[in-house]
Amino acid sequence: MNIALLTAGGIGSRMQQDIPKQFMNIYDKPIIIYTMEAFQKHPDIDAIEVVCLDGWHDILRAYAKQFNITKLVGIVSGGKNGQESIKNGLMDLSKKYSPKDIVLIHDGNRPLVSQEIISDNIAKCIQYGVAITAI
């Protein structure tokens, strides 16, 4: 299986807004939904899990339902920083999936990930056991 682990645990303090930036709307859709749609549309992604701020889980679930994100399998709380948030997500996934499954970790505030980048990362993980994208 290929699982997308999206991080959306930050508060976006530099944005100086009342809501976290991943939930800010652009053209009537939250940024996190654009990111989720990129992985939802990819034929090789089997599941999506999101690491999310406490207090925003139900809102994220509602948006996922509204925008037909059917691959969402879980939402887990973030940590004190990005590293801890990723750890929380990976620990939760380790209870559900095999160590042989591929996990793509992606920043939920970066919605412009292409289908090609997702495909290339999966292919490189299969070939080498690990992959990283730097833009």
Enumerate the language-model features and the residues they cover.
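Gly/Ser/Thr-rich helix-start
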Residues: 10-13, 29, 79-80, 90, ...
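Hydrophobic packing residues within well-ordered alpha-helices of enzyme cores
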Residues: 15, 60-64, 121
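Glycine-rich, phosphate-binding/catalytic loops in enzymes
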Residues: 21-25, 67, 120-122
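Conserved beta-loop-beta/alpha segment of the NTase-like Rossmann-fold superfamily
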Residues: 82-135
